[in-house]
């Protein structure tokens, strides 16, 4: 009996120490547990940067939701008749239950309100269903059963539907990318999976062949973004959203990656289960 009490006491002490270490470091994301092994955030970003710099587009598993932005020639498009231009076609079907890549990007997005720099109007919450084609900074949309409409301002209002689209072209600047992330609610792309967050601080640093920056907000929320420059026809914008909404388990966190990349067209499917990281 005495030995049993000593054993239980030892287990209780170890559990208490483990909880303390988990709670203290869960406040700032410093390490991730992927596939049972720990990897630092810097090493994680470096690995992603290395994969993307070498045009490795096979990095897809049950951990990630993935959206691809494809660079296609005019001959492959029936929407663009000008042979002097190329266009970026977003393709994919984003849902929480599945991710199937198709010829057009059909989607359902809940967008949070933000201020339009074009007309100063405040855009409220809306739900958008349709498809989008971006042509050298100009946007062609098909909403519901309407025809394609051309818009070069980046913001379109039609039938109480609002969206924000930004193209990654040769003229894209890192400041444009930063503004895109700051102004657009990335979490809304998950169609209500997580709440809307407001990011308060931003850190910026270089990674191989591109940039990376981090947006941090309240409630232990962090958005890590990598932007790979690559060649003129291969540009990648990757977003890693780390959240911790659990009040009873500070050592648990959910990470979701939404990747927009230039790539060749192909059909891919991804599992539906969300990635869970344990943090120290």
Labelled PLM ranges:
Residues 4-26:
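Sec-dependent N-terminal signal peptides of Gram-positive bacterial secreted proteins and lipoproteins
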Residues 19-104, 262-280:
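N-terminal leader/targeting segments and the immediate start of mature chains
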Residues 57-66, 100-106, 205-214, 233-236:
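Short, hydrophobic/aromatic-rich segments at coil-to-beta transitions
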Residues 64-77, 108-114, 137, 141-146, ...:
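Hydrophobic lipid-interacting interfaces of membrane-associated proteins
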Residues 85-141, 146:
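N-terminal beta-strand/beta-hairpin edge segment
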Residues 87-89, 112, 119-120, 206-279:
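Gly/Pro-enriched, hydrophobic low-complexity segments
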Residues 142-191:
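Acidic/charged, solvent-exposed loop-and-adjacent secondary-structure segments enriched in E/D, K/R, S/T
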Residues 173-226, 240-241:
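Short helix-loop boundary/capping segments
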